[in-house]
Amino acid sequence: MATESTTNTTTIIARADQHDIDLHKASDRVNFGSIKEPIDVPYLLGVQTDSFDWLIGNERWKARVEEDEKNGTNTVAHTSGLDEVFNEISPIENFAQTMSLTFSDPYFEEPRHTVQECKEKDYTYSAPLYVNAEFENGDTGEIKSQTVFMGDFPLQTPHGTFIIGGTERVIVSQLVRSPGVYFDRQQDRTSDKEVFGAKIIPSRGAWLEFEIDKKDQPQVRVDRKRKQSAIVFLMAIGMTKSEIAQAFKDYPLVLDALEKETLGTQDEALVDLYRKIRPADTPTPEAGKNLLDSFYFNTKRYDLARVGRYKINRKLGVEADFNDRSLHQEDIIATIKYLVALHDGAATFPGKRNGEDVDLRVDVDDIDHFGNRRIRQVGELIQNQLRTGLSRMERVVRERMTTQDAEAITPQSLINIRPVNATIKEFFGTSQLSQFMDQNNPLSGVTNKRRLSALGPGGLSRDRASMEVRDVHPSHFGRMCPIESPEGPNIGLIGSLATFGRVNPFGFIETPYRKVVNGHVTDEVEYMTADRDLDHVIAQANQELDENGNFVQKSALARVGEEEAVDVPVSSVDYMDVSPRQMVSLGASLIPFLEHDEGHRALMGTNMQRQAVPLIESERPLVGTGSEWRAANDSGDVIKSEKDGVVTYVSADLIRVMNDDGTTSSYKLAKFQRSNQTTCYNQRPIVHDGERVEAGSVMADGPAIQNGDLALGKNLLIAFMPWNGYNYEDAVIISQRLVQDDTLSSIHIEEYEIDARETKLGAEEITRDLPNVGEDAVANLDERGIIRIGAEVEAGDILVGKVTPKGETELTPEERLLRAIFGEKSREVRDTSLRVPHGETGTVIGVKEITREDAEEDGDELPNGVNQMIRVYIAQHRKITVGDKLSGRHGNKGCISRILPEEDMPFLADGTPVDIMLNPLGVPSRMNLGQVLELHLGWIAHSGWDISLDPNLEAEWKKLIPSGAEKAEPNTPVATPVFDGVKPEVLKGLLSTTLPNRDGDRLVGPDGKATLFDGRTGEPYTKPISVGYMYMLKLHHLVDDKIHARSTGPYSMITQQPLGGKAQFGGQRFGEMEVWALEAYGAAYTLHEMMTTKSDDVDGRVRVYGAIVKGDNLPPAGIPESFKVLLKEMQSLSLNVEVLNAEGVAIDMKDEDDDPASSADDLGFNIGARPDAAAKEDQKAEEPEYQ
């Protein structure tokens, strides 16, 4: 953030250090925030990169472990994920336990390809994983050691993504219930008594549930089976009655149950337990013991995980080591004691913490509390898949140990890596948590990587998720954003990590607080999990402080436990929030005046920023929040200098820097690449020759970034006024200027691919020589049959010429020999060229060709049966047009209804026409007042201001202006941080001190309104109108992608009705309700035509086509195909159905119609398949027929 301070907390300097601004290391915004943040926002992609570093145990992770050990903070896991999982599975022993296989020291070789190569050639960015495997033969004492290849392991790119098969993907973090012990309270259905229960939930293994029923009897449920006495269970795990009596001497409820228990020994208890769990089997004490051991005491099958042990220790006050991941007798005893204390209504429970006796609070658990929900990050998710793959491999190893000759066994011969590779590949390719990366703009990419999802394997399902799970919870504060969430069925199940949130080694989200000592706020910052919040009194970040950091007021508004915020004496405050934007996510923190927007609209605004399309020329917002710099900087879309140095060479695609240490660094820029969302990904240098850079300086902007600041849209002159009804119901009127100046134009790049395969009838061929195609259609193809770069193409144009052999029979060996000797006579081929699909157009900007020969030379991999693969890239220049969707940052979205000539737009007194007219009725009912305040501050920033122009030197609002923000030149970008922004009274004061224009006039008055003149008549409007600059975004919902029309096209094979949807070149559905509408009007002929000729009367539509071509009257309709399908369906149910005519005579329904194409030929005209419809043929599951 650009605000800085030394000791004085209230006075802040409004601009960043000029040195940093000059080096592109900070934003030059004038900041109106009044609160100094004691720490920087953590690295925004850390939630992805830190976790993967831990998994593979790389140098970055080792450095963090070293620092952690030095500081003694215990914020980093000290064993890497791969080491953990290989240690768990080792040793693999055979059934006789005479042989063992142990794994250790996993390591990676260098990746085979760079990230860029993987994107270009459809590879997976991965590195070979090796592990040291040691086989020991217990009979002979022989040990064989080998380094074993465990397959190619996908690696993370520096920006937290994975390249899988050439496409960029993100693994989303998952929100799940933490392992541990949970207590709940439920009302008994038959009586009014409350029934208390406890569940011990492991990370892996069977649940163990205890309950005190309505008769006050302690019960246990093993692995979700029948309930039985908890006393029997205690005896079964090895406790005698006297030991139980001693352990529970202070708990009469347990002692009463013990007296009533008739069983006397452990064996009897085991038999009783086994009988109830497995009623079909013969119960014996050994079987009972083996069953219990396999459920709860076998470390291979039962795992609490470190986090489960941590939660049990914390809840029950036991002190087992965090690495002890199994369940113990002490845990079970403590669980029952706590449950009895809860049942008896006790307030506290004796336990231990850090070696001291403490009284723990007794209460039921809230499962939606963030102390009980944890994050499975990318590293843990991949580790779990690896664990699954290795356990499958373990079975193979065991089998091979028994079948292979003991003398000849080597580690390599035992190991089969296929199951490991298959599980990892399946996870990256098909898991719900492995998502196609959102590359619409830099913000959408960062948000995608910071997303938290409660869905996925082991999580919730959207159909069964309750309102409670979806709702905002007090423990979300500073951890998960209460605003950013989808609007559909996933609302509340998918969230976003808060700005300052970070994930601790146990997977719980922590948020930072400033420590308060005796009413003095220090700069010491402590990160806390949600369950620690409850034990402290925490004040808000905007609590007023004096220059020494002491509270100005005697009392402060604070959170105490889970109660509503209350006023407390400042002496009792323990902590204070670090920043007002602490509670919201990055996306929400980019909305200026968020505090004045209603929640639902803020949610829409946050989501719509992610849909903004990068424009040809990016322009950063005049009114920002100060988060723009960080969002762009951490997105990975800017190029930053790695070392201090001087720029020696700059071109559009390369920057070279001579570093101070004598080395030279070269930085390659991405030029006009296609993103996952078909937007244009392009980087531009912002440094020049001879310029000094420091490590971390931004040297090149990415898409939707200007000078290192996020720039999603444009600053446009807005007037809030209706105009002839054209902006009714959120419609938007824009000026022709935005079209002709390419203000809101964007570039979209589509990729089209074709391959030439080996078929049964011979090889397909890429060629310019196509059957039945005129010279003009192949004019833009080169001699190979591939389109030239720079060609302008439209729907139906040929991009790559291809012919496929056609014929019914396979050639005999003799025929093939003769053809090989004498060359081919005119072979029967059909044209299967790649054509531009319907509705698409543009300029060819690139062609990539891979042939089998090239592939073998370069080591590229082409799929089996493919001889040649060609990709064509077409760029579209899309100007803003009627039907496109525009939006602001406050959920104020609208569709363009009219583009007015510039001269017809209303204009200001100096002749400046406005760019956009918005309907003022869009504000009051939506309650997103932030847009109006942004409008006014936008005008102030555009005009410039000088507070000395207000003659009242003692004006109260002037005291709220931070130092450095007293005056500014026109077009100075400003920042108004969320919840700490420009106050309305300051806004009013600044409006009265804006700089006059060159004529000496102030066009907008102190109330933010201006006199506008009608562009058509030149007359002034009767009332003044709110005018100012607002940041408007062009969203990805472009009319060019949605508009669609069809005359003839593909039909469904079964029903013979037109297919649906633009992708299939389908028709418009005339549904049930539309039929009712025609029925209501009695439009019988129209209705008849809709349901026969225009739908699925195959003969009829051919005859109608012929009649239209010849100019004849339309023939009567025939029988719809769907009627025949209905008859067939009834016949399949063994119903004999006959169709009778008016005279009652049975009509012979033809089973098979004549081929429609031949019927057409009989009528003397030809109807063929539309070439552009054929391009989408393979996208439909049902085989379409063409008419």
UniProtKB/Swiss-Prot annotation:
The RNAP catalytic core consists of 2 alpha, 1 beta, 1 beta' and 1 omega subunit. When a sigma factor is associated with the core the holoenzyme is formed, which can initiate transcription. The lineage of its organism: Bacteria, Bacillati, Actinomycetota, Actinomycetes, Bifidobacteriales. InterPro entries: DNA-dir_RNA_pol_bsu_ext_1_sf (IPR042107), DNA-dir_RNA_pol_bsu_external_1 (IPR019462), DNA-dir_RNA_pol_su2 (IPR015712), DNA-dir_RNAP_su2_dom (IPR007120), DNA-dir_RNAP_su2_hyb_sf (IPR037033), RNA_pol_bsu_bac (IPR010243), RNA_pol_bsu_CS (IPR007121), RNA_pol_bsu_protrusion (IPR007644). GO terms for biological process: DNA-templated transcription. It is an enzyme of class 2 (transferase). DNA-dependent RNA polymerase catalyzes the transcription of DNA into RNA using the four ribonucleoside triphosphates as substrates. Gene3D superfamilies: 2.40.50.100, 2.40.50.150, 3.90.1100.10, DNA-directed RNA polymerase, beta subunit, external 1 domain, DNA-directed RNA polymerase, subunit 2, domain 6, RNA polymerase alpha subunit dimerisation domain, RNA polymerase Rpb2, domain 2. Belongs to the RNA polymerase beta chain family. It catalyses: RNA(n) + a ribonucleoside 5'-triphosphate = RNA(n+1) + diphosphate. It comes from Bifidobacterium longum (strain DJO10A). It holds the Pfam family RNA_pol_Rpb2_3. Its EC number is 2.7.7.6. This is DNA-directed RNA polymerase subunit beta. Residues 1173-1187 have a biased composition (Basic and acidic residues). Transmembrane segments: none annotated.
